[in-house]
Amino acid sequence: MVGSVHVNGSVNGGNGTEERLDELRRLLGKSDGDLLKIVGIGAGAWGSVFAALLQDAYGRFREKVQIRIWRRAGRSVDRTTAEHLFEVINSREDVLRRLIRRCAYLKYVEARLGDRTLYADEILRDGFCLNMIDTPLCPLKVVTNLQEAVWDADIVVNGLPSTETREVFEEISKYWKERISVPVIISLAKGIEASLDPIPRIITPTQMISSATGVPTENILYLGGPNIASEIYNKEYANARICGSNKWRKPLAKFLRQPHFIVWDNSDLVTHEVMGGLKNVYAIGAGMVAALTNESATSKSVYFAHCTSEMIFITHLLTEQPEKLAGPLLADTYVTLLKGRNAWYGQMLAKGELSPDMGDSIKGKGMIQGISAVGAFFELLSQPSLSVQHPEENKQVAPAELCPILKRLYRILIKRELSTRDILQALRDETMNDPRERIEMAQSHAFYRPSLLGKP
Amino acid sequence: MVGSYAAGGGRGAAVAAVAEGKLDELRRRMGKADGDLLRIVGVGGGAWGSAFCALLQDAYGRHRDKAQVRVWRRPGRAVDRATAEHLFEVINSREDVLRRLIRRCAYLKYVEARLGDRTLYADEILRDGFCLNMVDTPLCPLKVVTNLQEAVWDADIVINGLPSTETREVFGEIGRYWKERIRPPVIISLAKGIEASIDPVPRIITPTQMISNATGVPLENILYLGGPNIASEIYNKEYANARICGADKWRKPLAKFLRQPHFIVWDNSDLITHEVMGGLKNIYAIGAGMVAALTNESATSKSVYFSLCTSEMIYITHLLAEDPEKLAGPLLADTYVTLLKGRNAWYGQKLAKGELTLEMGDSIKGKGTIQGVSAVHAFYELLSQSSLSVTHPEVKKLVAPVELCPILKTLYKILIKRELATDSILQAIRDESMYDPRERIEMSQRQCLYRPSLLGLPKVDITQA
């Protein structure tokens, strides 16, 4: 290929990678000399890793693509974290060499000694995410001015927690009012909101983005999957799934795919985005069970049977023909319950090392999305207007009555009238229905409530 | 309750009364008159079989005029010196166990064995509640019988705790003792392995089928109990669910009888799916252990493996059952725990770390039989038969079903053919050309994959079912 720039790596790898970049540029109508501009919004662990993966894969083609990440300015790094960061740097020869070469090392020495305050955006330029200090990333272009970051972006990657998505994208829409071309937006956010007025419904991050910016849903996609950011960046083999319209999901799946990061595509945006939020609810409970039973596999399996049956039941309320909870969605659920910050949070609560009063944003971990999701799902499913037939008592009940684990989590985390130990009581209640009954009920009856996702 | 043997405080008395009520109900159903004991026998002294009988002994053993719980195991299995030393440590670290042995004048033989002055035998220690495969978890004392005829000839309920690889042989012998029985017993099988027969047509043979063939007991009286099976956790009252599968007549009364506060038993009519899945998941548990060891417990890699192996399991289940239970909920929980912990996953880890080798065979001291190994062989051979061909989703030609199960194929080459190393399992899950697991699931649900002959059933039986 004439004119190809190979910084390193095999010719074959270079050709394949550049070809994928060229293909996406063509689809987006980028002419020669016009950079493909990709911006990550929000610098949590996964958002940072995602941007770093793209930088590692495509960053060398500097005349074709530019990858940036926006985060707010002003977040300082405390002394303890600075000391730990210094240890991480000094334990990694490659990182140490890189910082020395870029004349960026001494500020970490000063911070270690307490003589200087570092800021999150500053260290992120060197590849350190405040929520993931132990896993250094490649250097990144960090922008702290939102308008400068997004005004001409072609692809925007939403790495914000869902609780900040609406606010930030409303601001972004002011900068986009006069745009000619419509950007493509990929959302990584897993939380959801519930709205009860005028009718009960769920609001997903992609819906928030569409409402806030006016970008058509066709151009907004959700990327879900097991999301242990540090493992993915360290090239543990991972699968993800990009969900959305036909127009963009296949080309983006191809663009995002790497040898250790397989991206499949799916048209079922709703199920995957909502399930992404729903499984975080049950991940907190899984962490509690693991801690309270000293990692008992037997108790974990009982919990798993019940929580998956509740998830299936809820999914049937939300989607007319939901993807079966088997295969890929199952893998997401499996890893979310096994590891990840929501499960970690549940463990810490059960051990008494954290308490609900500390809120849902934890230093060093980021946002625990499961907490707000518990509130959202429970309030939504408690509405009498959504009543379903009780399988045994021959009366109408709100769907939440058939989800004992969700109810219990609500009372532990939101109402705070129960202790974490009560999650075990939910499992050990002999009167609890066989989880198979809940699944059969979900699959045999027409539970679907289109209004829950704002559909007529 | 008049005549109750309840001992201990009010709480204990209440529990005993509930248990006695359940026992009386089952006795009535089995036509036991006063003075005629309900005889329950566990066959095989493995971890789960022993723990299961111990649960029954703990629950019903006090009603000595109504029920008798026994365990049969073969005599002659010696306890080696290292195990005897470890057993001595376990005994001395548990005050309740130590007191019990002293009280029963059964302690000194363990001192002698510890010193190497005496050889203990597995049946001997099992009488004191020590299962050779589960030495760290002392059970209650058990009545152990080493003569098979004496154990089973008049049994009302038989619990099959044997590995599937021994089920046919032992029940073949039992069949001889039962030739003149008037009333057929009820049999509950815990065995999870399966066999494949390819002559005259390819089909799976399950332990319950082996038992029925060997003894002539009608299938109506044979049930399968499946579920997450970490025997020591269940005996230690970790909360657990299990599922008893079989004909209407017995499964509900037995579910009720077996249920305890920490051991919930649900019932299900789908014997086939649960029994076969019980064997199938052990295959993938070995692979899960390998992946866990090779990736240093990477949750991300585990999830990729989980996604792929569950899609293969779903596919295989659709070949075997006409309307299989969805792999969600309870069956999923079984799969989850089997992949997470348990001896098959443990075995996969040990192989991957090089701490065990295939040459050591599939019966491991202190662990018992690793059923997944023979199951790999059975399923692979069965699904390789060209007479079972299915349409390949992309190449549009007929292929044997195993061609669509890359993990099963890889495990076969690692464990049976032994032509691949354990890290090949990572290559299997990292193959970029591998199908989206969702496609395999959709194919199994869209095509009519069902092959009744695989479970030895002619078409007409399905119509009757």
UniProtKB/Swiss-Prot annotation, chain A:
Pfam family, one: NAD_Gly3P_dh_N
Binding site residues for NAD(+): 42-47, 190, 229, 341, 369
Residues engaged in binding substrate: 190, 341-342
Reaction it catalyzes: sn-glycerol 3-phosphate + NAD(+) = dihydroxyacetone phosphate + NADH + H(+)
GO MF annotation: an example: glycerol-3-phosphate dehydrogenase (NAD+) activity
Record EC number: 1.1.1.8
Keywords: Cytoplasm, NAD, Oxidoreductase
Main location: cytoplasm
Subcellular location: Cytoplasm, Cytosol
Cited InterPro entries: 6-PGluconate_DH-like_C_sf, 6PGD_dom2, G3P_DH_NAD-dep, G3P_DH_NAD-dep_C, G3P_DH_NAD-dep_N, NAD(P)-bd_dom_sf
Single biological process term from Gene Ontology: glycerol-3-phosphate catabolic process
Highest taxon in the source lineage: Eukaryota
GO cellular component, one term: cytosol
Active-site residue numbers: 279
Protein family: Belongs to the NAD-dependent glycerol-3-phosphate dehydrogenase family.
UniProt function note: May be involved in cell redox homeostasis.
Name of the protein described by the UniProt record: Probable glycerol-3-phosphate dehydrogenase [NAD(+)] 1, cytosolic
Organism: Oryza sativa subsp. japonica (Rice)
Curated annotation (Swiss-Prot), chain B:
Protein localization: Cytoplasm, Cytosol
GO molecular function, one term: glycerol-3-phosphate dehydrogenase (NAD+) activity
Enzyme Commission (EC) number: 1.1.1.8
Top-rank lineage group of the source organism: Eukaryota
Active site per UniProt: 281 (proton acceptor)
Main location: cytoplasm
Gene3D superfamilies xrefs: N-(1-d-carboxylethyl)-l-norvaline Dehydrogenase, domain 2 (1.10.1040.10), NAD(P)-binding Rossmann-like Domain (3.40.50.720)
Pfam families reported in the protein's UniProt record: NAD_Gly3P_dh_C, NAD_Gly3P_dh_N
Record GO biological process: carbohydrate metabolic process; glycerol-3-phosphate catabolic process; glycerol-3-phosphate metabolic process
Binding site for substrate: 192, 343-344
Catalyses which reaction(s): sn-glycerol 3-phosphate + NAD(+) = dihydroxyacetone phosphate + NADH + H(+)
Annotated residues for binding of NAD(+): 44-49, 192, 231, 343, 371
Any single Gene Ontology cellular-component annotation: cytosol
Biological role: May be involved in cell redox homeostasis.
Protein family: Belongs to the NAD-dependent glycerol-3-phosphate dehydrogenase family.
Name recorded for this polypeptide: Probable glycerol-3-phosphate dehydrogenase [NAD(+)] 3, cytosolic
Native species: Oryza sativa subsp. japonica
